[in-house]
């Protein structure tokens, strides 16, 4: 059924198993969106999912971010809480977003492919809230992160961190148990 395919899509995007009630709510939102849009992308589905469950499961948390950009170069100073350990670093990159992502990678080493980086203004004007979508891939596992903020660079950092946190959850769910590992050895 369409609902079953939707449930499978949620799993492939890195969301933990939902209760049947929660899937029903999300599927209804998905159908409403599909009626309005010609194409529904993975990022659209991620927006529909309530990220409340992530708040208790975040390994990586953004504490602070300072960015300078201009004709003389870009650099980001980033502070993260990774499993209760506070770390701070500074990186330069090819633009402010690259600098931010390099900081995150230095503090939390990982090897992912950035498949998508997308920014959308939620409203009009210079004070508009930006929604950033990030899709990363690691060994065939795809994770989509999203965040919104009036500061596009803060939203970018939060979206990337959100994608990493979902990937960490996905790793935990697909890791072999001790029994499975022992049986394989």
Residue ranges and their predicted role:
Residues 1-185:
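Terminal or standalone catalytic/regulatory effector modules within metabolic enzymes
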């Amino acid at each position: 059924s369409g609902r079953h395919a939707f449930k499978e899509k949620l799993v492939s995007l890195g969301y933990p198993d939902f209760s049947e009630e929660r899937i029903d709510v999300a599927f209804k939102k998905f159908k409403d969106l599909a009626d309005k849009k010609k194409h529904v992308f993975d990022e659209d589905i991620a927006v529909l999912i309530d990220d409340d469950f992530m708040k208790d499961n975040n390994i990586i948390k953004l504490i602070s971010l300072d960015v300078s950009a201009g004709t003389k170069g870009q650099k980001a100073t980033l502070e993260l809480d990774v499993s209760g350990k506070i770390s701070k670093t500074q990186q330069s990159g090819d633009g402010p977003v690259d600098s931010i992502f390099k900081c995150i990678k230095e503090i939390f080493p990982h090897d992912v492919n950035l498949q998508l980086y997308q920014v959308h203004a939620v409203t009009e004007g210079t004070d508009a809230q930006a929604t950033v979508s990030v899709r990363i891939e690691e060994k065939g596992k795809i994770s989509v992160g999203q965040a919104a903020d009036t500061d596009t660079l803060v939203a970018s950092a939060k979206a990337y961190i959100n994608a990493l946190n979902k990937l960490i959850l996905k790793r935990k769910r697909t890791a072999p148990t001790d029994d499975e590992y022992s049986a394989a050895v």
